[in-house]
Amino acid sequence: CIRDSLVRPIEYGADIVVHSATKFIGGHGTTIGGVIVEGGKFDWETSGKFPSLTEPNPSYHGISFTKACGPAAFVTKIRAILLRDTGATISPVSSFIFLQGLETLSLRAERHVENALKVVQYLNNHPMVEKVHHPSVTDDESQKALYAKYFPNGGGSIFTFEIKGDAQTAKDFIDNLELFSLLA
């Protein structure tokens, strides 16, 4: 999703990446969904840490997912067991909505990054803000180098910040938001 426009985790060694399709792929938060991407290079068998993939599975006639599926053991188990046991199958309408959102994802990702950086810079210089948490905010040279390496197109649009004051100050702040809204 948006993360892959900004950083490509599998290229940097991640074996599994989990995306929230709700937040960025759809673009409007109207549909709930997620995506699991497996790099396909991890040796599930040799690590000795994943018996649910390497040992015989009684619900699948004793097959071992690693023996039957090799590098695709994890994703096959997700499809075979998770979908069967939880019904986590996306509906046709949800699929359509996510596909519509994918058409504008790259443009939205650019705008998300631009807008987030403006807000992050504003908050980072605001006297009522204690600290801003975003990959672009650092004085440490090694952190700046990592930011440049891993986020050449920007550090994303998700950030947090701490305001100065007590719980009432925080409540008053939330009640007076105009640019953002609290959805939780």
Spans of features found by a protein language model:
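Conserved C-terminal alpha-helix-loop-beta "cap" of PLP-dependent enzymes
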Residues: 128-184
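Conserved PLP-enzyme active-site core in the AAT-like
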Residues: 3-125, 133
